[in-house]
Amino acid sequence: FAGPAPSRTAVDTNGNAYVANRWFANVPPVVVKILTEGGIDRNGNGVINTSSDLSNDGVINDAGEILPMADTNGNGIIDCPQSAPFTGCEIQDERIAWAVRVGPNNGLGRSMCIGTDGHLWVGMYNLGQYFKISSVDGHTIAGPVSTTPTAGQPNAGGGTPYGCLVDGSGTLWGANLS
């Protein structure tokens, strides 16, 4: 399998959803922010264009119902300026705030959680690392943060992030597959 593969989701206190796509094709994982309310009127038509259930069957799955987000210029990145003008934006669904790559190639993003400050932690399964990204615009705030403990610490050895949570005191906890 190659390409984007949705792996983990998180929902913030405002109801916005975040989706981490693993990417098995030796490229960095991509995190997408989907707004629960409002949107970004990128085409300037005065309407927030978004994917919708046109067939009224309770599922958005037909090609005509899903507004695409695709690498139309072939540079391997979903391009979209953060502010107007949105010329060349490859995100057509205007409830999608942003899509950003996180970490290096072959990271395989398999862990994502929201911290007490509202920002996201994304774990790289293949690399044993976490990156902290902004919930506002997706830029990297911190990282890489290794899962390999300092020598002499309990459970010495690297972790393969598969799930995570941040407790009330702001401590990042990770779960490994093995």
Describe the role of every protein-language-model region.
Residues W23-F24, E37, N126, N176-S178:
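Residue-level signature of beta-propeller blades and closely related beta-rich strand-turn architectures
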Residues Q129-G157, P161-S178:
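C-terminal or late-domain output modules
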Residues F1, L35-R101, I141-Q153:
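Beta-propeller fold detector
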Residues T9, V32-E37, M112, G123, ...:
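Hydrophobic/aromatic beta-strand positions that recur at structurally equivalent sites within the blades
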Residues D12, N16-A20, H119-G123, F131, ...:
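Conserved beta-propeller blade signature
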Residues A2-D12, R95-T116, T150-S169:
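Beta-rich, blade/repeat-based domains predominating
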